Amino acid sequence: AKFNNAIEQVYKITDWNSTLLSDSGNIENKKNNLTNDWNFPNINRDDRLDIVTWNCEFFPTNGDLTIDALSEAVMDLYPDIIAFQEIKKRGWFSKLMQKLPDYNFVISQQSSFMDQAIIYKKDLFDLVSRKELFAEDDYFYAGRPPMQCDLIYKESNLKLSLINLHMKCCDSGLFRRKEASKMLHAYIDDETNKGNSNFIVLGDWNDDLKDDEGEHCFEPFLNDNRFFFPTLDITYDISQASYPKEPYVSFLDHILVSKSLIPNNSYDISTIPIDKYMGSFSIYEEYISDHMPVLLSF
């Protein structure tokens, strides 16, 4: 009954906070039920914000084993914010959140399939607003409209506008990614001109910054000096490929940031080698995903 209630909560159209409640109305706390099967490090830094993008391939790719492994990874790594892509089963995501009591979340309501979700620490952030961009015109996004989540960082009253996206792959993917990127740039340009300047766009762009000009979707942002890709720093380092699976080793999971948010290049960017902490890529892929999480700290 409790799990059914959790599923009902996550599907409520108006329940954007998606707070998981027990039948008594209290927040379900199952932190003590976390597994301890892996040796994940704590990457959280008290003096910085730690933000991760993570494509969790067909979540949950391995049912309860995925829930156990991913919840352990999140609570051990303990970043402040994670943007997840490729949530295949929403009810199972609510099950994951029951094991992450330190986090609140928002999840897609208008994706045709494969939702996005953003989780954030309750004690650090307040949710201001949320919306799904281009939900009425999402063809170029393959039915997965980008999800914007505006948060206030309580410590400094800083407003962050996070946009979680999962670009089209395969077939007519490049053309549609280019058009999607133009739409997104026009939207962010308009918002920035209105004074909303602290954007972080993160997710699976399904393109590599190493690709030749014209062969990727990044041009609108690369040609705008108000924004930059921290992930450009590591995209040529094959050991940090966010998609390390042969024969398509590539860097697909990028983070774009407003320069005004991170002045003087005061940030760190890295791909988290989760596969090494789990023993091998094949084990990681079996339990969680074929994409690596990418971490931005500033």
Predicted segments, located by residue:
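N-terminal, active-site-proximal structural segment of metallo-dependent hydrolase catalytic domains
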Residues: 2-100, 104, 110-116, 136, ...
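Residues that flank catalytic or metal-binding motifs in active/ligand-binding sites
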Residues: 47-52, 113-115, 143-147, 158, ...
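Metal-dependent phosphoester-hydrolase catalytic domains
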Residues: 1-41, 90, 141, 150, ...
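Structural recognition of the beta-strand scaffold that forms the well-ordered cores
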Residues: 50-53, 80-85, 106-108, 116-120, ...
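A long, amphipathic alpha-helix that forms part
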Residues: 174-195
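Short, solvent-exposed loop/turn and secondary-structure capping segments
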Residues: 62-64, 93-96, 129-132, 163, ...
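Solvent-exposed loop/turn segments at secondary-structure junctions
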Residues: 56-61, 87-91, 110-115, 123-126, ...
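Structured beta-strand-rich core segments of catalytic domains in phosphoester-bond hydrolases
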Residues: 87-161, 165-167
